Amino acid sequence: MAKKLKTAIILQAREESVRFPNKVLSRVAGKPLILRLLGRLKDSKLKNQLIIAIPKNNKNDKLNNLLKKNKFNVYRGDEKNVLKRYYNAAKKIKAQIIVRITADCPFSDPKLIDKFITILKEKKLDYVSNTLYPTYPDGLDIEVFTF
């Protein structure tokens, strides 16, 4: 029997957007945008864990408090180095496959995420994405890779 690899969705989020400050906390149909997105991500059937990677600074405390209040797993890391934040979040939870989602892609589709995870596993690939050659509308960006 094949070993089951730990698959984690890591959502990159922050409050201090330049074009639309506090976008992730903006309300859509009465609920913060980030909670709507997380509700969709939770529906992925092939993920073992969902973690939100946010900068460790006081500018993101409101976001952190909202996520903790709603019982989400949060990793707070390097403010400037997003790659380091991702790496440390993945290392903390011992992920073997990472699904990279950004909070500015609020329409992430859990079925599409599961499809990409399946492709990565079945074809024994290291990387699957719909961003190298845009094949889906903006807001549906997904990257899946081994770690």
Task: Name what the model sees in each region.
Residues 86, 105, 109-135:
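Conserved donor-nucleotide/metal-binding helix-loop-beta segment in metal-dependent transferases, i.e.
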